[in-house]
A protein has these predicted regions:
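Hydrophobic pocket/interface hotspot
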Residues: 50-51, 60, 104, 141-143
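Glycine-rich portal/gate segments that line the openings of hydrophobic small-molecule binding cavities
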Residues: 31, 71-120, 171-183, 187-192
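Beta-strand elements of well-folded, non-transmembrane domains
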Residues: 43-47, 87-91, 106-108, 120-122, ...
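Hydrophobic ligand-binding cavity/cleft-lining segments
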Residues: 18-78, 168, 191-192
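Hydrophobic/aromatic beta-strand elements that line small-molecule binding cavities or substrate pockets
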Residues: 38-41, 70-72, 98-105, 127-134
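Beta-strand/loop substructures that line and gate deep hydrophobic ligand-binding cavities in soluble
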Residues: 117-168
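Bacterial N-terminal signal peptides that target proteins for export
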Residues: 1-7
Length: 192
């Protein structure tokens, strides 16, 4: 069955938090079981600070709800950085714990590329990227991901849930980063 469901949130007036966070766009598309997500926001923090926070896998679980555990693993045989993430999430009556082992490649202050290892993850395919750009004295943060879950996702509820989770995560991550930058804290110094 081939179906596509797309949700776009483009807030033309520019939704803003009390911190200055602006959520620009959030979209979720699914076709033939493969999800594509896109999120973009503008954050009142330097690109260097945003990059450092996003690369702190040992403390990444402190950024947003649903991430139960995150940590760096030993590098793989080629010397690539490896990380582990465990997510716990419920949508209505459907609850799932997901694990992901991934290769992490960072280009300091510019971008982070992440690729899950299917044999060690609950995803048949999962690639994501963070693009970090200076923009009008703030940081433009763009998140893109494409994934094939290795488990059943309720069709209409799943897309809605992923979109809501992405929007809530963008807000939570952005506000936490802005707060830490304003207070001069690293992610390691923040309590859970």
């Amino acid at each position: 069955m081939n179906w596509k469901f797309s949700v776009a949130v483009c807030l033309t007036l520019g939704w803003q938090s009390v911190f200055g966070l602006e959520i620009i766009e959030v979209t979720v598309d699914v076709e033939d079981g493969r999800y594509r997500v896109f999120g973009q926001s503008r954050i009142e923090a330097t690109p260097e600070f945003v990059y450092a926070v996003l690369m702190d896998y040992d403390n990444f679980h402190k950024l947003a709800g649903g991430i139960a555990e995150s940590k760096f693993l030993p590098n793989d045989e080629s010397g690539n950085m490896m990380a582990y993430t465990r997510f716990e999430s419920c949508v209505l009556f459907f609850c799932k714990t997901l694990e992901k082992v991934e290769r992490v490649v960072g280009q300091p202050t510019n971008s982070i590329q992440v690729e899950a290892i299917p044999d060690l993850s609950d995803f048949a395919f999962n690639e994501s990227s963070w693009k970090i750009e200076r923009s009008a004295g703030k940081t433009l943060l763009t998140f893109e991901a494409e994934f094939d879950p290795d488990f059943w996702v309720p069709p209409l509820i799943g897309t809605w849930a992923i979109r809501n989770k992405l929007l809530n995560s963008a807000e939570s991550i952005g506000m936490r980063i802005e707060w830490m930058q304003a207070k001069g804290l690293t992610l390691a110094q923040v309590s859970e």
